[in-house]
Amino acid sequence: MSTDKTDVKMGVLRIYLDGAYGIGKTTAAEEFLHHFAITPNRILLIGEPLSYWRNLAGEDAICGIYGTQTRRLNGDVSPEDAQRLTAHFQSLFCSPHAIMHAKISALMDTSTSDLVQVNKEPYKIMLSDRHPIASTICFPLSRYLVGDMSPAALPGLLFTLPAEPPGTNLVVCTVSLPSHLSRVSKRARPGETVNLPFVMVLRNVYIMLINTIIFLKTNNWHAGWNTLSFCNDVFKQKLQKSECIKLREVPGIEDTLFAVLKLPELCGEFGNILPLWAWGMETLSNCLRSMSPFVLSLEQTPQHAAQELKTLLPQMTPANMSSGAWNILKELVNAVQDNTS
């Protein structure tokens, strides 16, 4: 494998398509790739590490996490043991994404000066099907909110995130609830089940994620922390039953993930977050603050979504990468995908 990273500096757009499962992200990403296929070596698509999830040291994370909920409902496992098993299987989703993300980060030119302009073509595009925060933030929080995981599992996932390199463009994909339920029921991945409360919570959490990133551009997490009520069962039920979180141009802290993270288990007797978890909250905030957030509707055809994504490109934050590093990245991605085919 080549190790030359000193070639010509290039402008690169790192784009991460994310959102709830089963809405058509992968199809939209493939359509976007097809759109740019006329320009060789222009775009690199990084797919979900599905086969790693299917066989991680002999364990199937997808069947395991959904199967655990079925076993709990059938009374085959206690609620407490089900929460522990869910936390275990959720952790299996994290490692393939995290390792790949670390390799990508190491290849980036993190200097903030002299950014290569990407408003003049050609420039490179790295399009990833999900960002690691899907498995470390959004899905674990959603599992907790429906009772599938205990709060004890959250700090190790949410508060230990690595620093995010410059130029992360996070595109949260959305569809209407009827379209979502129709699509996820049709794709029928082995072991995957449709749980309406979980789907509803996940949709709310992704809107909270966007609100959180916007909020952190001008605020700190502790601004308004004391005004938040503890995340209680009433709030959890509301998140499970309706799309109660709205996308805000100017979010308040109550519109963000911090409204979920105000947990008695993380706080002292007066509601102040314990020092260790406060440091973790800073780590989480720094990671999210550095991202550029976008929203993309997948309600219409994949072709329409690809065109809409293209219109967002001029608004995105570029990064630098050498041509040698780009070639290394292609080799890495091809090696992983060859091993997962």
Swiss-Prot record:
Residues that hold ATP according to the record: 19-26, 183
Catalytic residues as annotated in Swiss-Prot or TrEMBL: 48
Recorded superkingdom: Viruses
Pfam families found in the cross-reference section: Herpes_TK (PF00693)
Enzymatic reactions: thymidine + ATP = dTMP + ADP + H(+)
EC code(s) of this entry: 2.7.1.21
Gene Ontology MF, one: ATP binding
Chain positions recorded as substrate binding sites: 66, 90, 189
GO BP term, pick one: DNA biosynthetic process
SUPFAM superfamilies: P-loop containing nucleoside triphosphate hydrolases
Keyword terms, alphabetized: ATP-binding, DNA synthesis, Early protein, Kinase, Nucleotide-binding, Transferase
Family: Belongs to the herpesviridae thymidine kinase family.
Function: Catalyzes the transfer of the gamma-phospho group of ATP to thymidine to generate dTMP in the salvage pathway of pyrimidine synthesis. The dTMP serves as a substrate for DNA polymerase during viral DNA replication. Allows the virus to be reactivated and to grow in non-proliferative cells lacking a high concentration of phosphorylated nucleic acid precursors.
Subunit field text: Homodimer.
Other known facts: Phosphorylates and thereby activates certain drugs like acyclovir (ACV), valacyclovir, and famciclovir to a toxic form, that leads to successful suppression of the infection, while the uninfected cell does not have this ability because it lacks TK. Mutations in thymidine kinase may induce HSV resistance to antiviral therapies in immunocompromised patients. The most frequently observed resistant strains are unable to express TK and are avirulent in animal models of disease.
Protein name: Thymidine kinase
Source organism per UniProt: Varicella-zoster virus (strain Oka vaccine)
Gene: TK
